[in-house]
């Protein structure tokens, strides 16, 4: 029983960590919208979650860090999420690839997904709590 609860919480923790990391990347894109030659960055949430849970299909293995203080691998691979540069939808004179419409929409979508995950976890804990009541 406790193993099942631990597995579910581990999945939820991993998913929330990836959502928070994606939120950081999207916020960074928005903050650097006027920075010349800045390239918008993002992660593919589905493949990052599969990679973090050890379900990746082939591909390169991530370097293991034995301490949180170690420098990250090139490309910002955190939580098993490989950072990708978003392709330009409209060319910019200063070389910046940030589209504020795309970034705001992705930020809002990610925030909604994060809120849904938190609501799911909260409901799960309420169910467990009611099951343990005499």
Description of each model-found segment:
Residues 1-134:
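Amphipathic alpha-helical polymerization modules
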């Amino acid at each position: 029983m406790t193993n099942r609860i631990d597995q579910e919480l581990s999945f939820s923790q991993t998913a929330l960590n990836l959502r928070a990391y994606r939120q950081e990347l999207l916020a960074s894109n928005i903050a650097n919208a006027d920075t010349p030659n800045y390239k918008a960055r993002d992660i593919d949430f589905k493949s990052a979650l599969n990679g973090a849970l050890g379900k990746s299909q082939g591909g390169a293995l991530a370097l293991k860090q034995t301490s949180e203080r170690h420098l990250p691998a090139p490309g910002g691979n955190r939580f098993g999420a490989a950072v990708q540069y978003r392709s330009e939808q409209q060319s910019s004179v200063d070389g910046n690839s940030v589209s504020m419409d795309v970034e705001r929409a992705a930020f809002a979508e990610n925030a909604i997904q994060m809120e849904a995950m938190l609501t799911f976890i909260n409901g799960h804990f309420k169910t467990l709590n009611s099951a343990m009541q005499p």
